[in-house]
Amino acid sequence: MYEDKINSAVAQQQALLDPFFIAHQEVLAGFAAHLTTTFQNGGRLFLAGSGPFAAIASLLGQQFLHRQTLERPSLPAVSLTHDAGLATFLAAEDQASQLFSRQLRALANDQDTLLLLAGTTLSPADREVLTTARQIGCRTALICAVHTELADTMPELLLQLPTDSLPRLLEGTLFAGHLLCALVEGELFGI
């Protein structure tokens, strides 16, 4: 019984990743090249994600900042997801949708990039940070499910995972983020 569940989860993940990376290989390589240039020119990467994607945004930010595979200089990456005090303060004033956008507006400039991680829906905070990033002049990227309703919040770079399963979305998003970090590390530090 356990073996069947394990085999099913592995098969689902393979069915997700194979078409995703075939369809998005050039986009991922282009985004990695953009981030490499951004870091070389003094720009920063800001990461955001709501719900369970906040943890992934935080982890990926740490891997860019500290390291993923080797000892190297820090890369300027900032996760906007871990300020619990600000989240509580804004929620108390019915301004929870400003959690990411307030931080981005205070910290970012037009040399920076925002990477937003989302599931099958965009939260009000997700939508607002995309809008704010565009107003500032940041480059915007989004990793989300293929059926996510974007409406007027279309990012410049869109990577859509072909599933609506939350566990598979989380795993696929984390894998894509790890790959992105590895590509940037490889280009900047020769690994």
Model-found features: residue ranges?
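Generic N-terminal amphipathic, Lys/Arg-enriched alpha-helix
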Residues: M1-A23
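Alpha-helical scaffold segments in soluble metabolic enzymes
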Residues: Q12, H34, Q63, Q103, ...
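Generic secondary-structure signature for well-ordered alpha-helical cores
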Residues: A15-I22, E26, A33, T37-N41, ...
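Short, flexible loop segments at the rims of nucleotide/cofactor-binding pockets, characterized by
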Residues: I22-Q25, F89-Q95, G119, G137
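Glycine-rich, small/polar surface segments that engage phosphate groups of diverse ligands
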Residues: H34-A108
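Short glycine-/acidic-enriched loop or helix-start segments at secondary-structure transitions
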Residues: I56-S58, F89, A125-E128, D152, ...
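C-terminal binding/interaction regions
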Residues: D110-Q111, L116-L161
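Short alpha-helices
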Residues: C144-I191
